[in-house]
């Protein structure tokens, strides 16, 4: 291998839903820390976070996922950013190139754990939600065709 080429960028954060929006927000010193509004959690009124201002339902729709998918919120956000990076690179067919994925994200799936933990032991169909606690890299790579 002779080197690595970074050909595209994508980002979804609490201050923007694209590279351009994030850049503008940084220049304008926008603050992305606020109360939790889009995740159902016992911590909603207790802590402030850098929350992505999209609901899980909006993310599912934007990614054209089925209702019964097991993408964690983290995986959906990472997948959206990866789609932006591929588009930013001008790539129309991912398999034309030797492609790798470097993903920098948080742990995923905690939202699924909070939602399904107590029912997990008596409802085997919920296993798919509890086992998705990686950062979503595999889901993102599969969605991109890697």
Where are these regions (language model features)?
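Conserved "HGTGT" condensation-loop signature of ketosynthase/thiolase-family condensing enzymes
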Residues: 1-146
């Amino acid at each position: 291998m002779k080197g690595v080429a970074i050909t595209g960028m994508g980002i979804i954060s609490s201050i923007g839903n694209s590279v351009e929006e994030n850049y503008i927000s940084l220049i304008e010193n926008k603050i992305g820390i606020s109360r939790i509004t889009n995740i159902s959690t016992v911590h909603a009124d207790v802590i402030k976070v850098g929350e992505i201002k999209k609901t899980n339902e909006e993310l599912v729709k934007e990614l054209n996922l089925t209702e019964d998918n097991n993408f964690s919120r983290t995986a959906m956000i990472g997948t959206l950013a990866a789609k932006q990076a591929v588009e930013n690179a001008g790539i129309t067919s991912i398999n034309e190139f030797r492609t790798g994925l470097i993903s920098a994200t948080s742990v995923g799936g905690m939202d699924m754990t909070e939602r399904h933990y107590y029912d997990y032991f008596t409802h085997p169909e919920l296993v798919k939600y509890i086992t998705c606690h990686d950062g979503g890299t595999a889901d993102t790579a599969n969605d991109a065709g890697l």
